[in-house]
């Protein structure tokens, strides 16, 4: 049966009373969806993008959304193989493959902290099995907790939420032949981005970072005033900034500037001869004798952590009515007391996994989590009960926050919510008697489960909205999402262990910023030492003020928390996005150029991140081609700027073709 080439006019508009949305694939007909082709390609996409996203996320703390590149590839391969009626299959490929970003975001923000703390506490054990099980169970829980909210977010709120990522992905899938032609451009961009980052990571052809210390006056400025400028010139980060856009990258950069160019120099000036170590006895230097990086590490980051945590709390408060309404709706359908539930079950495009199966599946998943905590993590019945209760309550409450954030801005504040989980879990576990190294591992595993659940919930609502617009069967998307979660959890566990063995998370090229923050928060709490509550409070106050001023507090707080050199390239990418989409007087031309730029940037991200994994494999195998003497030469940073300029020129040039 032929499918219309364009979405209906009411696809992005609020429906009038009695009006129904008619998707592209008619609810009255059946179409190919779950086939060996779609499942195989979905698994392949999950493996590839899990590896790429894990590398990039551990490097900079930002996980790129794989939905759009996967959709482009799905359309491209189906067009190249001349498959008919492939739209439903492409949605399944995208849905299975998109598990990559969700599982990666959940795992890498928390679980590397186990490795980080292991360096300080050798008795801590980290294994592939623990990482895999925590990621898998968190992903499964996120899917099960999100399904009861599908009808509310996807159908009832149709036209009220913009769903930016789902919109872009749907347009790619619907475009068909256009998407197939785009595949070549995506692959070319991936090749450019991949080679660019590969020659830096593997051969050190030029310096990865450019700093103001490369010149004499910059060194003097950094030593005397603690003001320093740094930027990473990688292709993947530049592409990420382009896709995020100028508004949010500017806010992130403002947060970074506030810490690095105001708070850090200000603390050095005010507390120049003071040792501030009330919460950390290992700090023995005066603030004035520290470098800018050390002041940021010991003080600035904690302000960012407080801001992220408060932004998460504000998100829960704002979403409370959504939680309540969705619970009422789900409970009515679970009891079978709703005529609309029976009607929806009969309509293919409104058919979910049975709520009874969801309830039983949720209980079984929580039981498995309890057994995992009891026998694999805590080795204590009471602690395991406390742990599973905390996981269940927090994951369920924050599910709507994650879905709501994705529906509105396409960004999931999962790191802030996980920080809250860790702080709460640490306080509760210490109160019931579980502390020290074993308490740290327990809290981090709990955080890993919750973080993956929330990340999966946010990502999955995007998939379901795509399916709603196109007309696929939600039940099939939901069922096969579990397979994607399994594959992604296994992949990210392996990549994480590889990268830790090659680089290490505590320092160096894989900073794992979120995981380092988790380790910094949990260590003092679990050892009975103080915590920088005053700094957390300052960050929380900043978040409240920003929210009151209607400025996205989470983006600003992330900027305060993530190192400067990883934030500045984001705003460079965002500025290029603005330039590309505003140069023409013709709005349609600007829109087309913006779409081309998104495609090229996606290629830079995917290629750069994938080749980063290849470079890590070479290092792990013992191949080291880096000449450190060359990287210490200022000319390596000069060459880095030239290469960076060429990369920017390439993207701008491609958008005008």
Predicted regions: what they are:
Residues 1-657:
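Alpha-helical multipass membrane-protein architecture
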């Amino acid at each position: 049966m032929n499918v219309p080439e364009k979405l209906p006019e009411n696809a992005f508009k609020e429906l009038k009373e009695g009006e129904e949305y008619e998707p592209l694939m008619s609810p009255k007909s059946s179409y190919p969806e779950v086939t060996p082709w779609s499942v195989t390609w979905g698994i392949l996409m999950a493996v590839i993008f899990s590896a790429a996203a894990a590398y990039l996320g551990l490097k900079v703390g930002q996980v790129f959304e794989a939905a759009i590149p996967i959709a482009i590839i799905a359309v491209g391969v189906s067009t190249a193989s001349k498959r008919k009626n492939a739209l439903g299959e492409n949605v399944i490929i995208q849905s299975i493959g998109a598990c990559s970003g969700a599982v990666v975001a959940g795992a890498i923000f928390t679980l590397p902290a186990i490795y980080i703390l292991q360096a300080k506490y050798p008795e801590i054990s980290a294994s592939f099995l623990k990482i895999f099980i925590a990621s898998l169970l968190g992903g499964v829980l996120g899917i099960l907790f999100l399904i009861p909210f599908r009808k509310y977010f996807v159908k009832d709120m149709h036209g009220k939420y913009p769903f930016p990522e789902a919109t872009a992905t749907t347009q790619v899938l619907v475009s068909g032949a256009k998407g197939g032609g785009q595949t070549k451009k995506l692959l070319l961009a991936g090749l450019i981005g991949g080679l660019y980052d590969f020659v830096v990571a593997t051969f050190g052809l030029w310096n990865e970072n450019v700093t103001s210390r490369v010149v004499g006056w910059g060194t003097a400025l950094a030593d005397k005033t603690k003001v320093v400028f740094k930027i990473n010139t990688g292709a993947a980060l530049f592409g990420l900034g382009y896709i995020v856009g100028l508004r949010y990258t500017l806010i992130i950069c403002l947060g970074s500037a506030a810490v690095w160019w105001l708070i850090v120099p200000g603390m050095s000036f005010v507390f120049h001869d003071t040792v501030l170590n009330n919460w950390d006895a290992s700090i023995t230097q005066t603030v004035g004798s520290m470098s800018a990086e050390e002041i940021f590490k010991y003080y600035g980051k904690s302000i960012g952590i407080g801001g992220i945590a408060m932004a998460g709390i504000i998100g829960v408060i704002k979403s409370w009515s959504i939680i309540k309404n969705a619970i009422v709706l789900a409970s009515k359908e679970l009891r079978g007391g709703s005529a609309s539930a029976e009607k929806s079950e009969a309509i293919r495009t409104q058919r979910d996994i049975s709520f009874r199966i969801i309830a039983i599946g949720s209980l079984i998943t929580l039981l498995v989590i309890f057994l995992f905590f009891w026998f694999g993590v805590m080795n204590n019945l009471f602690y395991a009960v406390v742990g599973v209760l905390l996981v269940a309550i927090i994951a369920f409450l924050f599910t709507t926050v994650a879905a709501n954030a994705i529906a509105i801005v396409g960004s999931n504040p999962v790191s802030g919510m996980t920080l809250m989980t860790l702080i709460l879990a640490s306080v509760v576990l210490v109160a019931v008697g579980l502390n020290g190294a074993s308490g740290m591992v327990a809290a981090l595993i709990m955080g890993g489960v919750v973080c993956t659940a929330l990340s999966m919930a946010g990502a999955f609502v995007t998939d379901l909205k795509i399916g709603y617009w196109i007309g696929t069967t939600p039940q099939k998307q939901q069922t096969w999402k579990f397979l994607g979660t399994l594959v992604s959890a296994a992949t990210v566990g392996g990549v994480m262990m590889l990268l830790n063995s090659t680089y290490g998370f505590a320092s160096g090229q894989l900073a794992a910023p979120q995981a380092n923050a988790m380790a910094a928060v949990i260590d003092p709490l679990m050892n009975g030492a103080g915590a920088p509550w005053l700094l957390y409070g300052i960050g929380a106050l900043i978040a409240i003020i920003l929210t009151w001023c209607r400025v996205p507090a989470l983006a600003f707080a992330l900027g305060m928390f993530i190192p400067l050199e990883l934030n500045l390239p984001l705003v460079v990418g965002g500025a290029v996005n603005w330039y590309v989409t505003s140069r023409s007087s013709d709005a349609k031309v600007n829109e087309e150029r913006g779409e081309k730029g998104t495609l090229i940037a996606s290629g830079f991200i995917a290629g750069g991140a994938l080749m980063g994994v290849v470079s890590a494999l070479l290092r792990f195998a013992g191949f080291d081609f880096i000449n450190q003497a060359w990287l210490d030469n200022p000319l390596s940073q000069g060459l880095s700027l030239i290469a960076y300029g060429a990369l920017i020129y390439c993207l701008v040039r491609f958008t005008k073709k």
